[in-house]
Amino acid sequence: MEVFQDYAYYYNLFYADKDYRTEAETVSGILKKYNAKISTIINFGCGTGRHDMELEKLGYYCNGIDMSQWMIDIAKENAKAEGRNITFEVADVREYKAEKKYDAFISLFHVMSYQ
């Protein structure tokens, strides 16, 4: 989707004030409330990977999926800049088939509105 090219470029700037850390802590709290053994998360619609990086800081292994190559490229750059070991993949979440099991999946922000 070509529309995401410019959006990806400005995404981090648009959401510079977004509190990803608190959102990740909220997600973690919800996951722990229902299952304390969750350690692997797949994030559908990861965008530039900010939630994934914050979740990794909380001890989770994350795999970020987004349909935009531009978003994934920036997510990889962001993770590398912060020294984070996160896997990011380009895929359409409607057709994605995971090659391994995950303990939980998340889809944050307004991902479904793009489908």
Residue ranges and their predicted role:
Residues 1-37:
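Conserved class I S-adenosyl-L-methionine
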Residues 36-39, 84, 100:
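Structured loop/turn residues at beta-strand edges in well-structured enzyme cores
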Residues 41, 105:
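Receiver (REC) domain switch-region micro-motif
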Residues 42, 49-95:
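Class I SAM-dependent methyltransferase SAM/SAH-binding core
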Residues 97-104:
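A short acidic, Gly/Pro-enriched loop at the edge of an enzyme's catalytic core
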Residues 108-110:
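Residues lining the SAM
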Residues 114-115:
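A short, conserved alpha-helix within the catalytic core of class I
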